[in-house]
Amino acid sequence: MQAMYGFGGGVALTACFSRLDIRIVMTEFPAAHFRRHRFPAEIITHAVWLYFRFPLSLRDVEDLLAERGINVSFQTVSEWAAKFGLKFANQLRRRSRGQFADKWQLDEMVVTIKGKKYWLWRAVDANGYVLDALLQSRRNKAAALRLMRKLLKGQGIAPRVMLTDKLRSYSAAKADLMPKVEHRSHKGLNNQAENSHLAVRRRERRMMRFKSARQCQRFVSTHGQIANLFLLHRKDLTAADHRQLRTHAISTWREIALSIDA
């Protein structure tokens, strides 16, 4: 992930959001503001980061900010997440384009929104990084084709191997778009993709389900890219290496977030 996101040095801003963190942010970096926003960009970007990085509700984020003397309503946090979340995610997506593993895992899960059933189609690479996610009303070949076209456009390259469950829509769509790609279809082969759905389930519980298909799509599109940045595979790292990579990830997040022309 270092090469993928162009990590550089920077000041760490930890998840605990301590007083020391805020002092570091305000003293080490020049104050920046987004147009037509009275709060500093550092506070807005941190609120957005908290909301998408952790399974927190909007009111949870409001309380975390209030505990540090920053009085922001949960409605304002919601507006920030809606306005800036996808902008940040798109910057991350552009940086990582075409740099994922060449083995892709695809999966779909059901999401119920206002009593209507939707299917959330998701693709991850062999290392668990989210390639893309697409909410659709169907679970058929046409839906699989839309996901694969989105993946090919986003990555700019086809995978070497594609792993799925036994849903026939995958093989039919692959035959049309990527006939030369090896396709392995078996229950359990796409565990990485299945596990990647857990974040959506956790958010569903916090929100008492998504309120609209648009809200769900916006969340999964943003969350996946931010989760990628902080997916550091801790079990394979020494404590020192993990701290260094986390610092680099936070530095990259700040660099991207504060470069947005809002």
Regions found by a protein language model. Name each.
Residues 1-114, 146-262:
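Charged, often Cys/His-bearing segments associated with DNA-binding zinc-finger transcription factors
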Residues 137-140:
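A short acidic/small-residue loop/turn micro-motif
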Residues 55, 114-130:
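Short conserved beta-strand segments at catalytic cores or DNA/RNA-binding microdomains
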